[in-house]
Amino acid sequence: QIVLCKSQDSHAWHERMLGNTEKMFQGLEIPYRIVNVCTGDIGIVAAKKYDIEGWSPREKKYFELASLSNCTSYQAVRLGIKFVHPDGTKEYVHTLNATGIATSRMMRAVLENYQTKEGGFTVPTVLQPYMYGLKEIRPVETR
């Protein structure tokens, strides 16, 4: 997700992006938590950053699956991105970005959280229509 918006709207957009990202994890029914990252840990570009971490049953801890940053006008100033108000004055936009799905990390979260005792895994309900109704993937015996 990428958003360019007016400064007064950037906080609301950041929260909306967080909601969009949360819906993916809720749909997949993967245990997750939201971390409001400390400003000392986000560097100079972002003014606010969330990390979404998914549960790893294998490691018995959370690991990062997605990040969402509100960079306010930092990037826009360097890129010269402005918008014009109706009265003709110009203002730098605020830029926001979010990881949609980090594919390999999401695959790990799905496989770990849906693994069966037999070594296969259950296909999350929300993904079953894309798997032609397949509900479980079982291991194949090799000789």
Where are the regions that the model predicts?
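TRNA-recognition modules of translation machinery and tRNA-sensing kinases, especially anticodon-binding
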Residues: I2-R143
